């Protein structure tokens, strides 16, 4: 797992209070990890702060899984 993936995983575990074993790249924030719409907004804000990137609303709507977040952040920080 990349450094970015590890950092994303840590944020998800802290914000959603889920077991780290459940946070896989395929895990859906809503369907698998129990996030609601407010949780997803807070996660996006936490990702922006942690990685120093801006995630516009239209992009945030496409980030549905942990893997989506990792890919977006890695592309934005490349």
Curated annotation (Swiss-Prot):
From its record, what is one biological process in GO terms?
Answer: lipid A biosynthetic process
PTM annotation, UniProt: 4'-phosphopantetheine is transferred from CoA to a specific serine of apo-ACP by AcpS. This modification is essential for activity because fatty acids are bound in thioester linkage to the sulfhydryl of the prosthetic group.
Question: InterPro entries under this entry?
Answer: ACP, ACP-like_sf, PKS_PP-bd, PP-bd_ACP, Ppantetheine_attach_site
- Is Cytoplasm among the key words of this record? yes
Q: Which PROSITE patterns match?
A: CARRIER, PHOSPHOPANTETHEINE
Gene Ontology MF terms in the entry: acyl binding; acyl carrier activity; phosphopantetheine binding
| Lipid biosynthesis is among the record's keywords | yes
Gene3D superfamilies for the chain: ACP-like
User: What SMART domains does the record tag this protein with?
Assistant: PKS_PP
Question: Taking the first listed entry, what is the main subcellular location of this protein, grouped into a coarse class?
Answer: cytoplasm
Pathway named in the protein's UniProt entry: Lipid metabolism; fatty acid biosynthesis
Sorted UniProt keywords: Cytoplasm, Fatty acid biosynthesis, Fatty acid metabolism, Lipid biosynthesis, Lipid metabolism, Phosphopantetheine, Phosphoprotein
Residues recorded with modification O-(pantetheine 4'-phosphoryl)serine? 37
- Give its localization: Cytoplasm
Where do the Carrier domain residues begin and end?
A: 2-77
The record's family statement is: Belongs to the acyl carrier protein (ACP) family.
Give the protein's function: Carrier of the growing fatty acid chain in fatty acid biosynthesis.
**HAMAP family tied to this protein:** Acyl_carrier
| UniProt name for this protein | Acyl carrier protein
What are the leading ranks of the lineage? Bacteria, Pseudomonadati, Pseudomonadota, Alphaproteobacteria, Hyphomicrobiales
The gene name reads acpP
């Amino acid at each position: 797992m990349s450094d970015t993936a590890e950092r994303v995983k840590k944020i998800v575990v802290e914000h959603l209070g889920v077991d780290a074993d459940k946070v896989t790249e395929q895990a859906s924030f809503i369907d698998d990890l129990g996030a609601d719409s407010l949780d997803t907004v807070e996660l996006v804000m936490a990702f922006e702060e942690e990685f120093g990137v801006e995630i516009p609303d239209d992009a945030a709507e496409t980030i549905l899984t942990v893997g989506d977040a990792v890919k977006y952040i890695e592309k934005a920080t490349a």
